[in-house]
Each structure stands twice: as C-alpha cells, then as structure tokens.
Amino acid sequence: MQAELSFIDLFLGASLVVQLVMIILFVLAGTSWWFIFDKWLTLSKARKDIYEFETDFWNSKNIEKTFNELNRKEDNFGLSQIFVISHEEFLKAENFEKAEDRINKSTEIIINRQEERLEEGLSFLSTVASVSPFIGLFGTVWGVMNAFSGLAQLSQVSINAVAPGISEALVATALGLFAAIPALISYNWSVKTIDIIIKSYENFTSELLITYQEFNVQKTTKK
C-alpha cells in the first residue's frame, strides 16, 4: 500500500510534461497487454487446431467423407480451409498436373491471407517495444532538467533538494521499460510462432499433393 501511495505521490508531484508522459506510457502498456493476450490466445488456438486436424485427417480412411463434412461449414480456417479448397481444385482438374498447379496457386493465396490475419496487432507491439523506452527517456530528461533548474532558486544545495525531482523523472524510464519489455517478448514469440504455423500449412499442402498424386497413379493403374 505504501508503494502505491508513493507512486501516486510521485505522479502528482511531477511536472505536467512528465505526467503526460506517464499517462501515455500507461495507455501504451495497457493496450499492448490486450494485444499480447489476444495474440497468445489466437496463436495457441491455431497451433492446437493444426495438431488436432492433422491427427484426425491422416487417421481418417475416407477423404471424401472428411471433405463433405468440412465443406458444409462456413468458418473453415487453417488446414481445414486449405484442404477444402485443395480438394475442390483436385476434383475439378482434368489431370494431376493441372490440379497441382491450381492447388499451389489457391493455397498460396489462402496461406498469405491467413498469415496477414495472424499478424494483426504485431506492428503495434513492435512500435510499443521500440518507442516506449524513448518516451520514458524523454520524461526522465525533462524531469531531471526541472529538478536541477530548481536548484538555482535555493541558497543551499543538498541531495534532499533534488532527490524528489529525480525520483519522479526516473519513474518515466521505469514505465517506458514496463511497456516495452513485455511487448518485445510477445512480438518475438508471435513472429516465431507464426513462422511455425505457416510452415505447417505449407508442409500439409505438400503432403496433400503427394496423396493426390498417389490417387492419380491408382486411377491410372486401374484404367
């Protein structure tokens, strides 16, 4: 409780500019935490969906049944959407060569769109991570300048005279780091996780093409 009161006292005792800096950093930190939580939920769900879909799909013995079940849904995303579009192109194509070309083009578009969707909010986290320390530093420099400018009005200089002003100024730096560090960690984790997800999409597409090629060989052999 004492720490909370101490911080409030520091905020109220700071100059208007430093107070504005603190408010801006609080807003940036709060907003970035919302994006951090949202990214964690979205990307964790995407990885879970990949695992569950691949497990069910490759264990399924009836690819047509799986396609019909998924084709009725309107909210396919990730591997399910890639499979539905790929299978539609495979059924429409006259031969495997044409099917392969159409599937590659269609899935490339889908994967790019899904990557854009997964990356939503990353630019904000990157901005917060890079800008917040400098905003905090600006508040600190401004506060220190005010603290030392006040010394000119004092007849006797002591550490007690400048300590409160410097403390208020350093709070701005601490808030800048408080906003930047979690945003940077979340950004790096999100970029790495998205890369893993996209590679999973691309690997599934390649494996699916191999499966369709085997189907084509079987049909040709029967003829």
Q: Which functions belong to the PLM regions below?
A:
Residues 10-13, 161-165:
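Periplasmic/extracellular loop-to-transmembrane helix junction in inner-membrane transport proteins
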Residues 46-159, 185-223:
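Predominantly long cytosolic amphipathic alpha-helical stalk/bundle segments
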Residues 1-55:
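Hydrophobic membrane-targeting segments
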Residues 32-36, 179-190:
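Transmembrane alpha-helical segments in integral membrane proteins
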Residues 21-31, 132-135, 139-142, 177:
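Residue-level signal for the membrane-embedded core of alpha-helical transmembrane segments
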Residues 169-183:
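Hydrophobic alpha-helical transmembrane segments of polytopic membrane proteins
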